[in-house]
Regions:
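Extracellular adhesion/carbohydrate-binding repeat motifs centered on closely spaced tryptophans
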Residues: 1-278
Length: 278
């Protein structure tokens, strides 16, 4: 009988069914308070089953969907009388899914802090995933990569022991990683307010002195920092511009004073300068 929007079943002795009922080979499930399961999941003998709009337990194999006011929940019904798959992996159409203890498909969540599932349920494999603003890489088996260096599409990355990708961070004081994770190599990189040169193998250049790049001379200290402003080297004063390049063949205004620098960068001082005939 129907009451307050729910269906109930009363036996001949008057007691209300609150478990399961087999009618001509069709199984119906009831909640503990007596209402019949409709468009829902019910349990019987320690197993979960999907129940359709007619209240009958579905015996067809495949995905089953239940929509709530906030989300869509997916289940997988097995060929074993429609029992829902629980605590198990499912390989389907080239993707791997995980059905939890209650039969619900995992999505947007971790499993054993090792696997992570997309919004539509498939485990990430051979792919990057951003979780809570942190990037992780998952190998071909879907496991979070925690083995250090990773080469991916021509770039080198570093994954820490917890699997998080280094970004805007140093490794061993020698390597530095971009905001998107790639390691700097054969290029300038900025950490904080300081520029560094990174060699082809990614290590920071720490050879103190001059460095020629793209027809400009730069000066690096022993820690690899690119210097700006005044530099004193081998008895001569040089001036490094705000972007690092050495001034030469030009005037520089510094602290309200003008200075002129030779073709090789040294500052003129204590001598006459003839320039443009003057």
């Amino acid at each position: 009988f129907n009451y307050d929007g729910n269906k109930y079943y009363l036996h001949e002795d008057g007691h209300m069914e609150d478990n399961a009922l087999n009618v001509n080979g069709t199984m119906y499930l009831f909640k503990s308070w007596g209402g019949m399961c409709v468009n829902d999941v019910g349990s019987y003998n320690g197993n979960y089953y999907y129940v359709g709009a007619d209240g009958a337990v579905s015996t067809t194999t495949g995905w089953k969907k239940i929509k709530t006011s906030t989300q869509t929940i997916w289940y997988w019904a097995t060929a074993d009388g429609g029992k829902l798959l629980t605590n198990s992996w499912l390989d389907y159409n080239g993707n791997s899914y995980y059905l939890k203890a209650d039969g619900k498909m995992a999505f947007n969540e971790w499993l054993d802090n090792t696997y992570y599932f997309r919004s539509w349920g498939a485990a990430y494999k051979n792919a990057w995933a951003k979780v809570n603003n942190v990037w992780y890489y998952f190998d071909g088996n879907g496991k979070k990569y925690t083995s250090g260096w990773l080469t991916y599409k021509g770039n080198k990355y570093y994954l820490k022991s917890d699997g998080t990708m280094l970004a805007n961070e140093w490794l061993d004081g020698k390597y530095y990683f971009k905001s998107w994770g790639g390691m700097y190599k054969n290029e300038w990189g900025k950490s904080g307010d300081t520029w560094y040169w990174f060699n082809a193998d990614g290590t920071k250049r720490t050879q103190k002195g001059w460095f020629l790049y793209d027809k400009n001379y730069y000066y690096l200290d022993k820690d690899g920092k690119m210097l700006t402003g005044w530099v004193y080297h081998d008895g001569n004063y040089y001036y490094m511009k705000s972007w690092g390049g050495m001034a030469h063949d030009e005037w520089i205004l510094h602290d309200k004073n003008w200075y002129y620098f030779k073709s090789w960068g040294g500052m003129y001082h204590d001598q006459w300068l003839t320039l443009n005939g003057s």
